[in-house]
């Protein structure tokens, strides 16, 4: 059965060698522990989010390391280790603790899964290292659970809700029911989107929560159907979003209700196809085909992986490059000094435009409102989006005045 989505008037929501930043790295005298910087990639290698990060994240980080070595020729070694956190907070935090204690890891990144990231953030602060959350979405990471040792890099649930959520409500989608992944990310995405809906005159009629990597969405979708809400907001991601959409199609739910995918990635569109997703509006921090810079990186990535990079994978490359440049500029791998350099240096590369890291660790940068093309409009493989608007980081992300982070001076 063909699945009907929000059209242009009432659009469903999704959130979602390379050039370096224009600023030159000014090296200081080097004082690197063991004369080596070691980066850990903690990701989902085999689960529901593996297409978003996974092996592609490992590839992106290795590309960043290789490119940095070639361009800057640092006088210290750079190595990478990686592991599968299995979407379990205890597995992830234990692995990171082991890396810090026994393997000399200086920085950990990717970190898909907000529950894992919240646990890793605590260990990272305790061990005085650095973690850069690229794949996680919960705003808790820069609000009540912020630390001086962590950065939230690519996107968050506030930006997802704020950029495109308003468009849905203002174009008639004013009653909502949420289908929510039952962990930190899903809770955060539901809350932030609910706030946007209510602030713009809409109503939230209810919600239901499903476990991560749910095997059957029928009972949850039937509750959503019974609510008679105009919009069923999918506060989940990856395989859960894909399976939610497929199940809704099978049950015929979209005859009378519309689905809003609150975080989707280009790999989700690729899996579902343009026939299913045409007309959707999405918010993302990256699109492979945006300009010559993104295409140049993406071609190299595609040659290695046979798919185009997600926002997370491109963000991993950018985050690692930003970190390594800060190490050179600081002349040390000591976390506080490196973090100070990162926060004081603008970020402008193929991934982040007008980027900067705020005092709460939130990296703000331009976000993009895009629309999924019709099949007839797509001219080549992965030609999926039209960019409809560029939203500045200051407008897309939560204002510092609303931050609950104790590091923010008010």
Spans of features found by a protein language model:
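Repetitive helical segments and hydrophobic/amphipathic motifs
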Residues: 13-16
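Extracytosolic ligand-binding ectodomains
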Residues: 2-10, 20-410
């Amino acid at each position: 059965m063909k699945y009907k989505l929000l059209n242009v008037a009432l659009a469903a929501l999704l959130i979602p060698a390379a050039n370096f930043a224009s600023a030159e790295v000014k090296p200081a005298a080097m004082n690197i522990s063991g004369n080596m910087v070691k980066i850990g990639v903690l990701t989902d290698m085999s689960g529901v989010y593996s297409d978003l990060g996974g092996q592609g994240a490992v590839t992106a980080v290795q590309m960043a390391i290789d490119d940095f070595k070639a361009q800057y020729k640092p006088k210290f070694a750079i190595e990478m280790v990686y592991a599968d956190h299995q979407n379990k907070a205890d597995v992830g935090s234990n692995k990171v603790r082991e890396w810090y204690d026994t393997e000399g890891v200086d920085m950990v990144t990717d970190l898909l899964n907000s529950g894992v990231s919240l646990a890793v953030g605590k260990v990272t602060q305790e061990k005085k290292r650095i973690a850069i959350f690229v794949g996680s979405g919960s705003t808790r990471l820069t609000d009540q659970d912020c630390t001086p040792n962590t950065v939230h890099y690519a996107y968050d649930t506030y930006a997802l809700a704020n950029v495109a959520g308003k468009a849905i409500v203002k174009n008639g989608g004013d009653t909502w029911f949420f289908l929510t992944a039952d962990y930190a990310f899903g809770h955060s995405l539901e809350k932030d989107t609910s706030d946007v809906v209510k602030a713009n005159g809409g109503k939230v009629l209810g919600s239901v929560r499903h476990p991560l990597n749910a095997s059957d969405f029928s009972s949850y979708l039937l509750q959503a159907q019974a609510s008679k809400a105009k919009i069923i907001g999918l506060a989940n991601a990856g395989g859960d979003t894909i399976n939610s959409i497929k199940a809704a199609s099978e049950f015929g739910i979209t005859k009378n209700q519309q689905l809003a995918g609150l975080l989707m990635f280009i790999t989700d569109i690729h899996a579902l196809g343009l026939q299913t997703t045409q007309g959707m509006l999405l918010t993302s921090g990256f699109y492979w085909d945006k300009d010559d810079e993104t295409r140049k990186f993406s071609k190299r990535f595609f040659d290695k992986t046979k798919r185009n990079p997600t926002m997370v994978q491109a963000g991993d490359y950018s985050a690692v490059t930003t970190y390594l440049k800060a190490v050179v500029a600081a002349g040390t791998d000591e976390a506080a000094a490196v973090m100070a350099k990162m926060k004081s240096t603008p970020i402008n590369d193929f991934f982040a435009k007008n980027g900067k890291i705020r005092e709460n660790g939130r990296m703000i940068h331009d976000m993009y409102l895009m629309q999924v093309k019709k099949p007839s409009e797509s001219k080549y493989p992965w030609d999926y989006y039209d960019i409809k608007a560029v939203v500045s980081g200051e407008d897309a992300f939560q204002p510092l005045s609303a931050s609950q982070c104790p590091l923010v001076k008010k």
